Each structure stands twice: as structure tokens, then as C-alpha cells.
Swiss-Prot record:
GO terms for cellular component: cytosolic large ribosomal subunit. GO terms for biological process: regulation of translation; translation. The lineage of its organism: Bacteria, Pseudomonadati, Pseudomonadota, Gammaproteobacteria, Thiotrichales. This is Large ribosomal subunit protein uL1. Binds directly to 23S rRNA. The L1 stalk is quite mobile in the ribosome, and is involved in E site tRNA release.
Length: 232
């Protein structure tokens, strides 16, 4: 098994120059070339930002609605009542409730990928922080998951919204689709993400903000991207 792995790694290393910045379409073509798994891998992106995440006013977080989606089916739970609950159901939310939904969460019944909450439901949701927080599911106004317009938030989540938060090294990690997307679709998704990241630039951030962009498939190596010709 090790021999197989090392042989594959050698083949990949021969195809990818770690020092080179590849044009976007070429980078996506390379991802497909070096993919050797049986499932359809996600295309992940890492963006190194010129921020100091140790400082609270330089923590970059937010959400981006990718024009071509992520290729994933997203199940949405919404904490809301009255007309807001009705609107959430109409928008396609799988689960809608208040205390009853909180009880299900406490029991560990969490068959959903995104949690959205209306502001008046936060008294209920607030009790679930220790359960939802570690799973990255806690609603937050900064990424649009605590909102008066729960129906729009549901539609955005279903349409392929990705959420991001800068890590301790100043890097954003998220997904922009699947390897079976066309290169154009992946490029458009990447452009949207980088555009939204630029809008989220902290006022105190100095120097180069978008420092480095690399893409990879789920099981593949990172490929540096030349993003200078992107429409951002």
C-alpha cells in the first residue's frame, strides 16, 4: 500500500510545481488530472490574508453565496415562530421550530447542515451554544444566520452559501464546488468568494490583503493560483 501511495505522490509531484502560480483554468485542470479516488471530490480553497487574527478588529468572517453552488445538498433548520416560521418552510427549510426544535437538538437529533434563527428566537437558541458551537452550527448575525429575513437566509443556504472565518495563521479555508464542475463554474465561484473577502477587509489591515490563493481537491495537494487576471 505504501509503495502505491509513494508512487502516486511521485507522479503528482512531477506534475505540480510547488513554486509556480498556475492560471486558474490550468489549476482546475490539474486538480482533475491528479485526482485518483472513486468519489467526486470537493474543490477546496485556501486564501492567505494580510491580517493579524490575534487582534479582534482583524478577524475576517462572513459568508458568500456562490453563483454555481457547492454541489452539496444542504439541510436547513430554522428557529422561528409565526409568519417567519411559515416563510422559512415555504423557502425550503427541512426543520422549523422553537422549544420543540431545541429539545430535538438536546437529544442529539441534528440531521441538518445549517442553523438559522430569527432574532426573537435567540433566547431559545442561546441555551444550545455548547451543543451547536463545537459543530460550527451556532447562528451568528455576522454570517447572516441570525436575521429577520429567515426565508432569504434559507434560500441562500440552499443556493450554495459558504461561511468562512480566518484561522490563527491568517488563512481562510472553504469549498467552491466539486471537481466535476466546469472550470468556468469554479472560476466564477472563486471570483465571488474573493470579491466578498475583499469587501470584508478590515479597515486597519495594511499592505497586501489577498496574499496567496491555493486550490486543492479533498485528497489532493494544494496548487497555487495566479489570481491577478480574475474579475475581482
Amino acid at each position: 500500500m505504501m509503495a502505491k501511495v509513494s508512487k502516486r505522490m511521485k507522479e503528482i509531484s512531477a506534475k505540480i510545481n510547488a513554486e509556480k502560480k498556475y492560471p486558474v483554468s490550468e489549476a482546475f485542470d490539474l486538480l482533475r488530472e491528479v485526482s485518483s479516488v472513486k468519489f467526486v471530490e470537493s474543490v477546496d480553497v485556501s486564501v492567505a490574508l494580510g491580517v493579524d487574527p490575534r487582534k479582534s478588529d482583524q478577524v475576517v468572517r462572513g459568508a458568500s453565496v456562490l453563483p454555481n453552488g457547492t454541489g452539496k445538498t444542504v439541510r436547513v433548520a430554522v428557529f422561528a415562530k409565526g409568519p417567519a416560521a411559515d416563510a422559512a418552510k415555504e423557502a425550503g427549510a427541512e426543520v422549523v421550530g422553537m422549544e420543540d426544535l431545541a429539545d430535538e437538538v438536546k437529544k442529539g437529533n441534528m440531521d441538518f447542515d445549517v442553523v438559522i434563527a430569527s432574532p426573537d428566537s435567540m433566547r431559545v437558541v442561546g441555551q444550545l451554544g455548547q451543543i451547536l458551537g463545537p459543530k460550527g452550527l451556532m447562528p451568528n448575525p455576522k454570517v447572516g444566520t441570525v436575521t429577520m429575513d429567515v426565508a432569504k437566509a434559507v434560500r441562500d443556504a440552499k443556493a450554495g452559501q459558504v461561511r468562512y472565518r480566518v484561522d490563527k495563521a491568517g488563512i481562510i479555508h472553504t469549498t467552491i464546488g466539486k471537481v466535476n464542475f466546469t472550470s468556468d463554474a469554479l472560476k466564477q465561484n472563486l471570483e465571488q468568494l474573493l470579491t466578498d473577502l475583499k469587501k470584508a477587509k478590515p479597515a486597519v489591515s495594511k499592505g497586501i490583503y489577498l496574499k496567496k490563493v491555493s486550490v486543492s481537491s479533498t485528497m489532493g495537494p494544494g496548487i497555487n493560483v495566479d489570481f491577478s487576471d480574475l474579475n475581482i
